[in-house]
Amino acid sequence: MPEPAKSAPAPKKGSKKAVTKAQKKDGKKRKRSRKESYSVYVYKVLKQVHPDTGISSKAMGIMNSFVNDIFERIAGEASRLAHYNKRSTITSREIQTAVRLLLPGELAKHAVSEGTKAVTKYTSAK
């Protein structure tokens, strides 16, 4: 069975630059698509909690998947709550209720207090 022809090596995952240019065969440069992630924010929180600790790219990938998963769960639950109450807008109240439903005990309490603090900070900055 003949082996398929190998193309150029795949670009390295998780590179530092958001937009780089890949070389095409005919000499024209093409912009690589942006990969959105929470890595910058995960890193900032890590440095607040443990300033002398680093994180591997594999661990960062896991954290990114975790944040995406939790975001989707909360958004889905908040959407359901808005639908049940015949509302077309997801407010902080739906998010708060979704967090209370999804997260266990003490974790939910901490998440709600941090969320309330963030909303207060945002509204006071306006």
UniProtKB/Swiss-Prot annotation:
Q: Where is this cross-link: Glycyl lysine isopeptide (Lys-Gly) (interchain with G-Cter in ubiquitin)?
A: 35, 121
Q: Provide the positions where the record notes the PTM Phosphothreonine.
A: 116
Q: Which organism is it from?
A: Homo sapiens (Human)
- Where are the N6-acetyllysine modifications? 6, 12-13, 16-17, 21, 24, 86
Q: How is it modified after translation?
A: Monoubiquitination at Lys-35 (H2BK34Ub) by the MSL1/MSL2 dimer is required for histone H3 'Lys-4' (H3K4me) and 'Lys-79' (H3K79me) methylation and transcription activation at specific gene loci, such as HOXA9 and MEIS1 loci. Similarly, monoubiquitination at Lys-121 (H2BK120Ub) by the RNF20/40 complex gives a specific tag for epigenetic transcriptional activation and is also prerequisite for histone H3 'Lys-4' and 'Lys-79' methylation. It also functions cooperatively with the FACT dimer to stimulate elongation by RNA polymerase II.
Modification ADP-ribosyl glutamic acid occurs at = 3
Please name the GO terms of the biological process aspect recorded for this protein, alphabetically. Answer: antibacterial humoral response; antimicrobial humoral immune response mediated by antimicrobial peptide; defense response to Gram-negative bacterium; defense response to Gram-positive bacterium; innate immune response in mucosa; killing of cells of another organism
- Point out the gene that encodes the protein: H2BC12
Q: Where in the cell is it found?
A: Nucleus; Chromosome
> What's the protein here called?
Histone H2B type 1-K
Question: In the record, which positions carry ADP-ribosylserine?
Answer: 7
Could you tell me which residues carry N6-butyryllysine? 6, 21
